Structures are given as C-alpha cells and as structure tokens.
C-alpha cells in the first residue's frame, strides 16, 4: 500500500514572498507567492514548487533561519536560503534550499558508542544559534557556521515508566512581531517536562513536570507579548496555558473538539501577531482563538477582574477552506507580510487561502 504524503511543517520567509514545506516523502519544497491580486481564488488551485530536492532518508526535524528570504543580498550573513535537517543515523546538516546541496554537517556523534544521535527537535534563533534536542533530554547549542557544539547538557534524571526522556520541541515565537531574543529558551519533552535552556548556566533547569495521561509535549508557543506560554500535548484534547512567570500551575486551557492522537497526522498550532492562535482540524477546517484572548492568557480583554476564572475555552471561530473535508488540515501558518493570507497543508498538497474563506 502506497504511503500517503503528508506535510510535516511550513516555514514562511521573513518578507512573506516565499515559503518552504517539508514532507514525509523526504522532500523539501520552496514556493513563491503568486503576484495575483485576487488570492481568494488560490485555495482552489494547487501550488507548484519553485525549487525542490529530496534527501535519501526521512526527516525527523528541521528548522529555517528566522531571517530566511530569497532576496537576501547581505553576504556577511549565513542566512538566506538555508535549512537545517536532522535524521536517524545521520549528522545534523545545513542545506541550501536553492540547489539542495549540503553546506555543513554538525558533530552530533555520541562519543561513547560512535553513533550519530538522532536530533528530534531543532531551532535556529535570531542570533544564528542552532539548538538541538535528543535522547536523555540532551540539548546542544551550535554556532550555525561551525560544526562543533559550543554548549551541551544532558539530564541525569530518568523518565517515569512509560515516558520518553527526549527533547521533543523548542519554544516557538510569533513571526512578524518579535525580532529580538527574549533571553532563555523553553523546551519540552515527551515525558511532559518543560525545561529552560540558558547557555550562561551549566545545566538545564526543569520548570514544569505534569503528571497527565497526555503522551508528551509536542509544541510550546509563546504569545506576542512573551507573557504566556501555550503547550500542545499528544493524546490530549486541550492546549494548556501558563503564565511564563509561573510555569508550575496551569492558568487556563483551550478546548479542542478532537484529540491529538499519537499516530495521527501532525496537527500543528500557530500563533501570529494579527489573528492569535490557529490550528487545523481532522475535518479540514481551521480553529482560531483571537489575538486579544491569546495575549491575555486565555482571558478575553473585555472581562473584568471580578469575572470567574475561565478554565476551558472553546474556539472563538472556525473557518472553512472550501477543500475536501475528509483530509486533515495539518499545518496552517500566516504570511508575515499579509496576515490574512495563510499557507495551508491539506494532506500532501499546499494551498494559499484567506482567513474566513
């Protein structure tokens, strides 16, 4: 039986003129945004990639420089068309999106057994540092232009029974809002732990451990003002909200009309500066919680302090995309230059749509 092609993630360029999609067919595709004025019609048309290349093995993790653009003429920055890709039994590698050539391989070899460690999560920050997460809650930090890690830490604690001590994700900040580093970085694990990564210290600091039936943290999203953290977990039907100053206690939850199953297509949430938090559904629609609610930690801005605490918040809107309702909308991300325009993965195809379309 032929394996279905599914989009694993989408990355917009910082100027909104192009974006990149990564798929489970080992392919990495780059798209140009059409210059048509009536982009409302684009959700009925398939987009054709401007460039594409394929690796010879599956892609476990990947990340693009936050300053990625096709039109970067500043030659003293190692940015532009670069993507870092992690796989099994292979080093983390930096590729050119234009020609698919490997530019640099990072040293991810385990010195004890001589094998390459699988990079399960990776992130590039605004200062060109590459963060990697692997087994036993190991985090390493690289300068993007150098193969050897400049900082490394591995947890000595064992995960509880049935849990995996793997760093599964790093904190994601909204595009189009922040351009500066917010200091220490959060990361999550499949053992439902949340850590703080700060290269000024010698070790990871565990800030949160949740005893829940959920199957591990898969995303950590930050509000545009940086005050609230939204945590997505596998085997869960809610998104947890925390105050960044107190990550020990759940503040509110966003209620999902479905459960994020361990073996289902990846459904990714996303926060942008204009529309708040959005997430695709198994039915091909898009759920949304508005910016005001997201920036206030799940409490609508019109609520007074005397109002009771909201504990489970349903979506404020649900948008239909005029696409096949039997195929999940796995990834949805807004264009930084035009927040009403978003790239949507629908199975293995990529579309451009307008919110509310």
UniProtKB/Swiss-Prot annotation:
<protein>
    <recommendedName>
        <fullName>Protein SWT21</fullName>
    </recommendedName>
</protein>
<dbReference type="GO" id="GO:0006397">
    <property type="term" value="P:mRNA processing"/>
</dbReference>
<dbReference type="GO" id="GO:0008380">
    <property type="term" value="P:RNA splicing"/>
</dbReference>
<dbReference type="InterPro" id="IPR015943">
    <property type="entry name" value="WD40/YVTN_repeat-like_dom_sf"/>
</dbReference>
<comment type="similarity">
    <text>Belongs to the SWT21 family.</text>
</comment>
<keyword id="KW-0539">Nucleus</keyword>
<keyword id="KW-0508">mRNA splicing</keyword>
<keyword id="KW-0507">mRNA processing</keyword>
<dbReference type="InterPro" id="IPR036322">
    <property type="entry name" value="WD40_repeat_dom_sf"/>
</dbReference>
<comment type="subunit">
    <text>Associates with snRNPs.</text>
</comment>
<dbReference type="InterPro" id="IPR051150">
    <property type="entry name" value="SWT21/TCAB1_mRNA_Telomere"/>
</dbReference>
<comment type="function">
    <text>Involved in mRNA splicing. Helps to stabilize the U1 snRNP-5' splice site interaction.</text>
</comment>
<dbReference type="GO" id="GO:0005634">
    <property type="term" value="C:nucleus"/>
</dbReference>
